């Protein structure tokens, strides 16, 4: 069985190409993944890391659907599946980069994909939850949580910054099954392995 966490961790330094697949003995059913990635200016320092994660995850877990946003959200699964990693990241940033509005993004996600979220779906949000004082639409986040197997929020900011300034993270984490700081490969691998091992 493919060890997805280790493979993704190893793939990111090689531009998302899983040259060194790792295998585990325990058979596990692969979950359906929907990943929502913030590519706004406030996460500019981490945007490539987050998009590399999407690129590698989609490569090793074919049932992954990927979405990107700053305000308006759109699906980027085809871009990540068909283009070289650097070109895919450039296209995503060009199309979806800008000022952040999580409420708008969650509304768009609800219209595009909420009907397909069910007890077999893990939804991952990658972003800093900084929302420019706009309405974060916690109601929509709660609706996603109620439908999904897991709702996981990965924040590239240190936990000591959560809730400071325009960060909505302290409110957001109450609507998630799991909320974690994620700014390096080791943290990322732990979360991915949890996604695969958790049988709620």
Residue spans of the language-model regions?
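…and closely analogous acidic/polar surface helices at protein-protein or active-site interfaces
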Residues: 31, 36-68, 72
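Short acidic, S/G/P-rich loop/turn micro-motifs used as interaction or catalytic elements
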Residues: 42-44, 73, 130-133, 160
């Amino acid at each position: 069985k493919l060890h997805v966490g280790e493979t993704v961790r190893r793939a990111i330094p090689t531009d998302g190409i899983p040259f060194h697949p790792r295998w585990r003995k325990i058979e596990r059913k692969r979950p359906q993944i929907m990943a929502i990635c913030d590519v706004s200016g406030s996460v500019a320092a981490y945007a490539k890391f987050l998009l590399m994660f999407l690129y590698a995850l989609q490569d090793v877990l074919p049932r992954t659907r990927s979405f990107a946003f700053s305000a308006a959200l759109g699906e980027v699964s085809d871009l990540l599946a068909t283009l070289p990693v650097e070109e895919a990241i450039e296209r995503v940033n060009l199309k979806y980069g800008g000022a952040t509005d999580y409420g708008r993004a969650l509304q768009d996600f609800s219209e595009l994909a909420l009907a397909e979220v069910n007890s077999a779906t893990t939804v991952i949000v990658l972003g800093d939850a900084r929302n420019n004082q706009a309405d974060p639409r916690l109601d929509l986040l709660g609706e996603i949580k109620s439908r999904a197997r897991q709702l996981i929020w990965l924040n590239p900011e240190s936990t000591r910054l959560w809730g400071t300034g325009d960060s909505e993270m302290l409110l957001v984490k109450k609507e998630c099954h799991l909320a974690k700081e994620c700014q390096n490969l080791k943290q990322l691998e732990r979360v991915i392995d949890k996604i695969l091992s958790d049988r709620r």
